[in-house]
């Protein structure tokens, strides 16, 4: 099905190799799986009314992969939503402002490009030597929510992949003292927008190979001169080491996030240990 000649312009540069065809099918399959498993398509779509999704496009490999996968599914009638790509130009020095609008126009993708100088705010508020990422992210998120409302979108879609989710889990474990990560679907604090991560089951390495193979115009993520905090770098290095020593370890750890047994943890808010009876211990369906 994915090898038809009738393809979206986003795939016009697709290599004809067996390796790329397998990569493409795997990514599309993983995205469909996440959309279905986590109920990302709203009830309105299932009843015949198309919701509108704001797909955030930074110009990095992950957001290009997200846009291409969603557009592929929509193109083939497998995703009953309207897609609006959105790039928020935050005023970072050296940001190539024409790259994304020209690319999206050429690809025929509906889009909105907005300039908001959050960079100056971040530079003014964050002390020298500290990472800018947290404040920058909050300001970006607020603007994206506003744009989604203005465009009549019901959901904001982000390009976080499987490895982002794993790294966040371990950062919360090591530094926050809690078991939590980025969920594939949540409702914002105001209660009026979904936040969706359809790449939740996609490996970062697959995103990198995919975007490179299609020769998408990648924009560096460190134009502001800041990098992710040291904690995330350390966690990423740790996961890389585990994966090198035991190939497939990342996928096993990710599977654990989908296979939680509250009765075998220690949180009384999730499992009623005090009310546990002897008969419950031999239940065929332990919680």
Curated annotation (Swiss-Prot):
Residue span of motif PP-loop motif: 58-63
Cofactor: Mg(2+); [4Fe-4S] cluster
Cofactor binding note from Swiss-Prot or TrEMBL: Binds 1 [4Fe-4S] cluster per subunit. The cluster is chelated by three Cys residues, the fourth Fe has a free coordination site that may bind a sulfur atom transferred from the persulfide of IscS.
Keywords on record: 4Fe-4S, ATP-binding, Cytoplasm, Iron, Iron-sulfur, Magnesium, Metal-binding, Nucleotide-binding, RNA-binding, Transferase, tRNA processing, tRNA-binding
4Fe-4S in keyword set: yes
GO biological process: tRNA thio-modification
Root EC class: transferase
A GO cellular component entry from the record: cytoplasm
Its EC number(s): 2.8.1.-
Disulfide bond annotation, renumbered to this chain: none
Binding site for [4Fe-4S] cluster: 133, 136, 224
Entry's localization field: Cytoplasm
Keyword Iron-sulfur: yes
Domain of life: Bacteria
Catalytic activity: cytidine(32) in tRNA + S-sulfanyl-L-cysteinyl-[cysteine desulfurase] + AH2 + ATP = 2-thiocytidine(32) in tRNA + L-cysteinyl-[cysteine desulfurase] + A + AMP + diphosphate + H(+)
Major localization listed first in the record, in broad terms: cytoplasm
Pathway(s) it belongs to: tRNA modification
A family per Pfam: ATP_bind_3
MF term (GO), any: ATP binding
Note, other: The thiolation reaction likely consists of two steps: a first activation step by ATP to form an adenylated intermediate of the target base of tRNA, and a second nucleophilic substitution step of the sulfur (S) atom supplied by the hydrosulfide attached to the Fe-S cluster.
Subunit: Homodimer.
Protein purpose: Catalyzes the ATP-dependent 2-thiolation of cytidine in position 32 of tRNA, to form 2-thiocytidine (s(2)C32). The sulfur atoms are provided by the cysteine/cysteine desulfurase (IscS) system.
Family classification: Belongs to the TtcA family.
Designated name of the protein: tRNA-cytidine(32) 2-sulfurtransferase
Gene: ttcA
């Amino acid at each position: 099905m994915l090898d038809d000649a009738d393809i979206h312009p986003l795939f016009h540069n697709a290599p004809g190799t067996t390796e790329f065809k397998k990569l493409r099918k795997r990514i599309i399959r993983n995205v469909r799986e996440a959309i279905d498993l986590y109920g990302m398509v709203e009830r309105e779509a299932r009843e015949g009314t198309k919701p509108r999704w704001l797909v955030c496009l930074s110009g990095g490999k992950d957001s290009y992969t997200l846009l291409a996968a969603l557009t592929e599914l929509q193109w083939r009638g497998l995703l009953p939503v309207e897609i609006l790509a959105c790039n928020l130009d935050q005023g970072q020095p050296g940001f190539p402002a024409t790259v994304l609008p020209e690319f999206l126009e050429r690809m025929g993708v509906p889009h909105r490009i907005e300039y908001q100088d959050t960079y100056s705010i971040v530079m003014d508020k964050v002390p020298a030597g500290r990472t800018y990422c947290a404040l920058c992210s909050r300001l970006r998120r607020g603007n994206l929510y506003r744009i989604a409302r203005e465009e009549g979108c019901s959901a904001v879609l982000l390009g976080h992949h499987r490895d982002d989710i794993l790294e966040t889990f371990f950062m919360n474990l090591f530094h926050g003292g809690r078991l939590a990560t980025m969920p594939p679907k949540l409702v914002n604090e105001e209660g009026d927008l979904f936040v969706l991560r359809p790449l939740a089951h996609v490996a970062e390495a697959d995103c990198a190979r995919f975007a490179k193979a299609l020769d998408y115009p990648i924009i560096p993520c460190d134009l502001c001169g800041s990098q992710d905090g040291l904690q995330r770098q350390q966690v990423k290095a740790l996961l890389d080491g585990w994966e090198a020593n035991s190939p497939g370890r990342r996928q096993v750890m990710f599977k654990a996030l989908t296979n939680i047994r509250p009765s075998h943890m220690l949180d009384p808010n999730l499992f009623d240990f005090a009310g546990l009876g002897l008969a419950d211990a031999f239940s065929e369906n332990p919680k």
